[in-house]
C-alpha cells in the first residue's frame, strides 16, 4: 500500500537574535514575536520571547550582544502568510522608565539553510513639538499597543517614524514536504553569513 501524500508542510526555524547597534543608547533588551497567516499553526517551540539586558561592548563596535535563541516549528497548507519575526527593543530613559528604542520586522528566509539578516529599526514619533516635550517629560514615548502592527501594512502610511539602530539575526531554516506539495524553495542558501550583511526589511 502506497504511503499517503502529506497534506501539510513544516517550517523549522532555529537561530538567535544575535546583536544590535544603537549608538545613542545602552542597557537594552529585545522582545520578539512571530506574525503569520491564518493557514499557519505553531507545532513546537516558542512564538515569542524576551532577552536579557545587554550593555555595549567596550571595543570600537559598541555592540549590544544578546545571542538570544529562537526555536519554533510551524505547519501550513500553503505559503500565503509566510511567517515574519517582529522585534521590539526597549531601554531606560533619563528617568529610568522603560521606553521603546526600536521596532523592526523581517520575513523568515524562504530557502533552507543558514541566513544572516540585519534589520533597520524605527520608532514612532510625536506629531508636534509640544507632544514631544510632554511625552519626554511624562516618560511616555509614542509606541504601538500591539507590536505586530509592524508586520502589517494597514495604517502604516499615516504613522510618523524615525530610523534608529540595527538588529542582527541568525536563522537556520529547515523545510519538510514542501516539494511533495509542489513548492520549490530553491537551493540551500548561505548568503549573508560568510560575507557582510546588508540591511533587510526596510520599514514601509
UniProtKB/Swiss-Prot annotation:
Keywords (A to Z) from UniProt: Cell projection, Cilium, Cilium biogenesis/degradation, Cytoplasm, Cytoskeleton
Superkingdom, natural source: Eukaryota
Main location: cytoplasm
Any matching Pfam family: B9-C2
Disruption-associated phenotype: Mice display impaired cilia formation associated with renal cystic dysplasia, as well as ductal plate malformation of the liver and polydactyly. Additional phenotypes, occurring at varying frequencies, include randomized heart looping, holoprosencephaly, microphthalmia, cleft palate, ventricular septal defect and thinning of the myocardial wall. Depending on their genetic background, mutant mice die between 14.5 dpc and P1.
GO MF, one example: hedgehog receptor activity
Keyword Cytoplasm attributed: yes
Keyword Cytoplasm: yes
One GO BP annotation of this record: camera-type eye development
Domain C2 B9-type positions: 9-127
Listed InterPro entries: C2_B9-type_dom
GO cellular component: centrosome; ciliary basal body; ciliary transition zone; cytoplasm; membrane; MKS complex
Subcellular locations according to the entry: Cytoplasm, Cytoskeleton, Cilium basal body
Known function: Component of the tectonic-like complex, a complex localized at the transition zone of primary cilia and acting as a barrier that prevents diffusion of transmembrane proteins between the cilia and plasma membranes. Required for ciliogenesis and sonic hedgehog/SHH signaling.
Family: Belongs to the B9D family.
PANTHER family hit by this protein: B9 DOMAIN-CONTAINING (PTHR12968), B9 DOMAIN-CONTAINING PROTEIN 1 (PTHR12968:SF1)
Oligomer status and interactors: Part of the tectonic-like complex (also named B9 complex).
UniProt name for this protein: B9 domain-containing protein 1
Protein species of origin: Mus musculus
Upper classification of the organism: Eukaryota, Metazoa, Chordata, Craniata, Vertebrata
Gene of this entry: B9d1
